Amino acid sequence: MSFMDQIPGGGNYPKLPVECLPNFPIQPSLTFRGRNDSHKLKNFISEIMLNMSMISWPNDASRIVYCRRHLLNPAAQWANDFVQEQGILEITFDTFIQGLYQHFYKPPDINKIFNAITQLSEAKLGIERLNQRFRKIWDRMPPDFMTEKAAIMTYTRLLTKETYNIVRMHKPETLKDAMEEAYQTTALTERFFPGFELDADGDTIIGATTHLQEEYDSDYDSEDNLTQNGYVHTVRTRRSYNKPMSNHRNRRNNNPSREECIKNRLCFYCKKEGHRLNECRARKAVLTDLELESKDQQTPFIKTLPIVHYIAIPEMDNTAEKTIKIQNTKVKTLFDSGSPTSFIRRDIVELLKYEIYETPPLRFRGFVATKSAVTSEAVTIDLKINDLHITLAAYILDNMDYQLLIGNPILRRYPKILHTVLNTRESPDSLKPKTYRSETVNNVRTYSAGNRGNPRNIKLSFAPTILEATDPKSAGNRGDSRTKTLSLATTTPAAIDPLTTLDNPGSTQSTFAQFPIPEEASILEEDGKYSNVVSTIQSVEPNATDHSNKDTFCTLPVWLQQKYREIIRNDLPPRPADINNIPVKHDIEIKPGARLPRLQPYHVTEKNEQEINKIVQKLLDNKFIVPSKSPCSSPVVLVPKKDGTFRLCVDYRTLNKATISDPFPLPRIDNLLSRIGNAQIFTTLDLHSGYHQIPMEPKDRYKTAFVTPSGKYEYTVMPFGLVNAPSTFARYMADTFRDLRFVNVYLDDILIFSESPEEHWKHLDTVLERLKNENLIVKKKKCKFASEETEFLGYSIGIQKIAPLQHKCAAIRDFPTPKTVKQAQRFLGMINYYRRFIPNCSKIAQPIQLFICDKSQWTEKQDKAIDKLKDALCNSPVLVPFNNKANYRLTTDASKDGIGAVLEEVDNKNKLVGVVGYFSKSLESAQKNYPAGELELLGIIKALHHFRYMLHGKHFTLRTDHISLLSLQNKNEPARRVQRWLDDLATYDFTLEYLAGPKNVVADAISRAVYTITPETSRPIDTESWKSYYKSDPLCSAVLIHMKELTQHNVTPEDMSAFRSYQKKLELSETFRKNYSLEDEMIYYQDRLVVPIKQQNAVMRLYHDHTLFGGHFGVTVTLAKISPIYYWPKLQHSIIQYIRTCVQCQLIKSHRPRLHGLLQPLPIAEGRWLDISMDFVTGLPPTSNNLNMILVVVDRFSKRAHFIATRKTLDATQLIDLLFRYIFSYHGFPRTITSDRDVRMTADKYQELTKRLGIKSTMSSANHPQTDGQSERTIQTLNRLLRAYASTNIQNWHVYLPQIEFVYNSTPTRTLGKSPFEIDLGYLPNTPAIKSDDEVNARSFTAVELAKHLKALTIQTKEQLEHAQIEMETNNNQRRKPLLLNIGDHVLVHRDAYFKKGAYMKVQQIYVGPFRVVKKINDNAYELDLNSHKKKHRVINVQFLKKFVYRPDAYPKNKPISSTERIKRAHEVTALIGIDTTHKTYLCHMQDVDPTLSVEYSEAEFCQIPERTRRSILANFRQLYETQDNPEREEDVVSQNEICQYDNTSP
């Protein structure tokens, strides 16, 4: 079939001779401009094909020319270009049309189409214009997007209530039929009841003469009328305006069209001259012309329909409570005339065993739900209220205060309920429905009203409010004649069914487009339940989806709902006939010699027997069981459920003992959780009675026979209670989903997880498709679709979150204290399920374990363990799921009490992202005797075994605070168990990282005295003494003077302005004045004590600095402590200033962010080997000739590097020798050398030589290796290459150094895009792997050519370096800010910048100082007045500096001057900041003395300091200030163990 044959209009038509071509001129209306409108393009092609098919064309070229004449720009321009490229004689007409279609076709925008539909309504457009526009828009819909029934439902939502109700009663089967019925209904209404229309709310009928305005419709075009926001531009008309349909099948062909009527001034109704429509006599004689014409036959539109009239219920919300009986069960009922439908609680439905049927989703909010919620289940209820029998349908809710709520539709249908329950004043007779019957005699229709069978003639002067029709199908099914009514004048068409829409079907604010439209949507289902309309009770914002309700199926895409509605349901259908086709069947193998059960039924009560019979009958109906003649029999028992119903269980214990076990391991829950990774959206599925969906092996069915008091039955499906049933089911589910990595299956619980909604729909489709193929049914109400958080196997799983369920934690928290071993075991069993959330769980639970093992009595220790476990679980951190692409760090620890570990996820900067899991284990008695090294290794091995499913085969970091691993690996003959551990350890890929530990003997941090400057320890405040300060305080004195308690004041001149301001406020403002009061001679502001100015610092010192009341917290906490008790003006401002100038806070609190100083890179190198940088790589294992260090020298221009093997004993003289031999002799003398402050570079010999050679030596600031970033980056690459090359021969790493240097210099750099060799030499040296061509031939250049080539490379390289430097500055300086200091300023220095890390750093101050700035090096580096004993340089980068904020009034004491005063105040020494070994003096800081000042103590005076304080400050001084012994930086070390971990890593 050709492309043209697939387009409407492309079929075969009778051919005419080509001479007829002049008779087919170009049609201006048949044009295509090239808009991306698929509907218009298809119409254009169809019309063109239709016209051309009627002519005999000589060739394809003439057909192309004819089609081209109907194209306008830009389509015409495309056609010209296409024909010129292809050649008009070379292409076929089919190719031309196909090209046009592919170029301009655009798939329709479904959202835009639906938005356009929502703007249509019969009330605005009239029925004909509605039909025309709806059809035009609907034709743009993809053919398979929606079923015919869904299209009908969508269309009927646009009709007025009158038309809507009548159309759905006729059950149209196609959209065309629905539109036809709507047109006929509207036409009939106009002819029956001229001059009447509904008012705005549709509740009453008012008389009005309709004047039809002569208005025209604009031709509807998708691009012109579908705007970006989806609104449709239309011409406004009266809601009763209906343009005649000239081509309607019930209209005569000779009838003039509407345009002709307008042109010739004809009546729209009778088509005659001389009058208008509202004056037409023929139209007024409506009762004499009731039959509508039809082409085929004359059919009356409405047969005899009884018309029922109800007395209007007052428009008020009447409510009443009443207890009614349903099936002898008392039900608490609310009669509410304000509710638009009826509801019933789920527990009553289950108790009364009502049959539940599905409905489209109903969204509601109000009395029955505080938030928007959705339900899609309903039941039919038969009620009897006094002598009134009622049948109603009610939606099912999970939670509601009342068990049943009967709403307005039922109360309007049965007014007698109002008289009985709500006590209305109408008499019972007046509340009886009045029935009107219509009869047609001699083509004249008359109406009669019937009351108790006595008809009387009446004159009908208004439109009927209710139409009532008998449903014969319902009557046949239920044995009675159920009446279905249709309301035309009420807001809710409740007479058809209470489960209907509340909003106006014709309203433009309809919300149907916000909900998925089900495939099975229909106007009226066969059982009489109208359930196709998506119902709302209150309007909901678009896309406002509430996921709190259990029914989330409606949130899925439409195509998923349509595809899988049959398998996602709340009821379990009968056993399908092809269930035996399932590849898995359950069999029962009996042990040899075992006897099958032959047991009698248990005794049951009559009530229980009835329950058993009901359940058995339901199983029989579903074909799950059949009557049996088996020789076996097992008894049954009834197990009560939480909702009061029962579950039938078969006692298969005897059968299970005789069955051969078939164990199949269930998946580990922690393994399942580890697969979630970075999932963002989740769905949980629960199979509906999963066991009952697997058939029994026919030969083994008789073994499942069970006996009840009324008979014997056997299962055709797998029953619950069989010993091997879980294995069969688990094996079946594992085989079904084994290859899907996005699915976790645990028996009948299924979790689907994805990283995006689009991916999730595909995953969900895959899983549901397999379930559908296996005939497995999913229980809808237990599923949760497409949510960001869900519950699975007792865990709450969300985005980057795994947490225990709160109600499970609450159950553990409320668990009573165990008194017996059994209770203790039960408690630990609950704890063990969540032990992954509890750090050191085994250690905490050890006292309970001792009690269970009868090694201890229950004491206070066990009580504390219980409380600790409960607190740890309830306050447990939220774990993050394992992500195979992330970086992980495992930290282990071991002690005599047990071993523990924590697995953490870290980012690329080694910062913590979250905890993945905890592990802990108690030690056995023998393990407690292991040496410390083996015990630490045991902890590592156990932790690796526990997290093996995550870490094996993945690189990670292993942290431990013990060097056991290295020492044990170096043993010649380790113990056998250690050897096994080391072999096991070798199967993992990890980097070993040792936690920093103490290397010097220091005092215990806990026993150390405070060594920083702190204000005097505050004493409790004596508020009585404040009275003496009132006179000098401006506020207090003003208040006392106003209260006549004070006549004179002592306010200082500085405070006089504030004093006068307070006086003025007290005189003029009542609000200000009433806040102050005097009690016991103390001034209060409201209920807070007013603090004088001179006592404000004392209050802040107490609540900020005091060891009991303070704690040096921040502004918020300190304000919260002070403000409820004390008051003074600008209280918050005072607290902010006080804390900002607190010395202790400045020293101990981390400064965030520490991004001071803008990035200032080194100047760009001018040429090759003019500017070089160098550094050392240390920590290498010694080689056979004792080489254990590498000198790295890098040309900052070409990035070429030399790696020179040497020894750590290298001194300055030997360093100079290496530079001459390997650098200067090959490349000449550089202008600058950049390095760190290594002792070899700071040596006098090195400095003297570089000075004589004219080399400028630039060094980094203290502890800031980023200054020499070039060397640091090169060393990182060198370390990686060493691990790759020397992994199998670590003792001879120096052998591989030349190869590593060649590989490094041959590799292009990211900055320059070329290799260092190419930049330096002008060519890439030849290698065996490549042929020598291109730039390699540069070696054969002439001298002039080579010079030109190198010069070009130099210019290009400088430009690239400058560009890279600008980009680096731009990227790094975005989050930085400059810190500008002046000479003489005091600053605090971060401990990481200058001082050595030691033990107990958590209790050490973060900043030290203050120190004075003595010289500015540049904007990023300053020289400080550091102590003269310090050998390190005094230049510090601003990254580690913080301005010291000075508070003069915080230091009330002066420093001691005389020796006697120093000795007397020796106990006030708080810190040692320097030692002058020449003069044997000690520089100290003292309490309450300005910290910028130091006190010099002689050696004899220093010995007078209390011993405890002296030892403490000396220990702190050694730890923070002394020079490090090892000049090498630890981060450059490549340890033996690190190299071993990279045996499989390529460079």
Curated annotation (Swiss-Prot):
- Chain positions recorded as Mg(2+) 1 binding sites: 686, 748-749
Keywords from the UniProt entry: Acetylation, Aspartyl protease, ATP-binding, Cytoplasm, DNA integration, DNA recombination, DNA-binding, DNA-directed DNA polymerase, Endonuclease, Hydrolase, Magnesium, Metal-binding, Multifunctional enzyme, Nuclease, Nucleotide-binding, Nucleotidyltransferase, Nucleus, Protease, RNA-binding, RNA-directed DNA polymerase, Transferase, Transposable element, Viral release from host cell, Virion maturation, Zinc, Zinc-finger
Instruction: Summarize what the UniProt record says about post-translational modification.
Output: Initially, virus-like particles (VLPs) are composed of the structural unprocessed proteins Gag and Gag-Pol, and also contain the host initiator methionine tRNA (tRNA(i)-Met) which serves as a primer for minus-strand DNA synthesis, and a dimer of genomic Ty RNA. Processing of the polyproteins occurs within the particle and proceeds by an ordered pathway, called maturation.
SUPFAM superfamilies recorded for this chain?
Acid proteases (SSF50630), DNA/RNA polymerases (SSF56672), Retrovirus zinc finger-like domains (SSF57756), Ribonuclease H-like (SSF53098)
Q: Where does the protein end up?
A: Cytoplasm; Nucleus
List this protein's GO terms for biological process: DNA integration; DNA recombination; proteolysis; viral translational frameshifting
- The residue ranges of the RNase H Ty3/gyspy-type domain are 893-1011
InterPro entries in the record? DNA/RNA_pol_sf, Integrase_cat-core, Integrase_H2C2, Peptidase_A2B, Peptidase_aspartic_dom_sf, Retrovirus_Pol_polyprotein, Rev_trsase/Diguanyl_cyclase, RNaseH-like_sf
Q: Where is the Reverse transcriptase domain?
A: 620-797
Q: Which GO terms describe its cellular component?
A: cytoplasm; nucleus
Q: Matching Pfam families, A to Z?
A: Integrase_H2C2, Peptidase_A2B, RT_RNaseH_2, rve, RVT_1, SH3_Tf2-1, Ty3_capsid
The chain residues annotated with the modification N-acetylserine are: 2
One GO MF annotation is: RNA binding
Q: Where is the Integrase catalytic domain?
A: 1159-1324
Anything else of interest in the record? Retrotransposons are mobile genetic entities that are able to replicate via an RNA intermediate and a reverse transcription step. In contrast to retroviruses, retrotransposons are non-infectious, lack an envelope and remain intracellular. Ty3 retrotransposons belong to the gypsy-like elements (metaviridae).
Q: What is this protein called?
A: Transposon Ty3-G Gag-Pol polyprotein
> Whose protein is this, by species?
Saccharomyces cerevisiae (strain ATCC 204508 / S288c)
The gene coding this protein: TY3B-G
